[in-house]
Amino acid sequence: MLPRITSNVSVFPTEPDANPLQEWLESLASIATRVPDDVLVLPSHNEPFRGLHERLKTLITGHEQRLARMHTELAMPKRAVDVFGVLFRRHVGADMLIMATGESVAHLNCLIARALAVRELDASGVAWYRRA
């Protein structure tokens, strides 16, 4: 649990159909029911903080909003790299491409699991995503 940024939730090449984002969102909701709000959070980055439940709510809401925007973007078929703008405010350079692609696919796989999107491979094996 980090006070300002969100964890990188990514799909890795070894499990291309995984849905780690849904699992992560469910774990955040579970933490809210099991850990008191006034607990002192000791994050791996930045300073300790209180207000766990508000932070959990902010994280869940933020990712749900990104999922909704991504769904809107999929009116026309897109590749995972084509929806970076929905997730990231800054340009994704070569040094962040693998991590950004993994996070993009995590959001796309979540939409697929919710029956809101589909993935189709073209003749070259490139995955294209569109609304279901």
Q: Could you describe each region identified by the protein language model?
A:
Residues R69-A132:
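C-terminal regulatory/interaction regions
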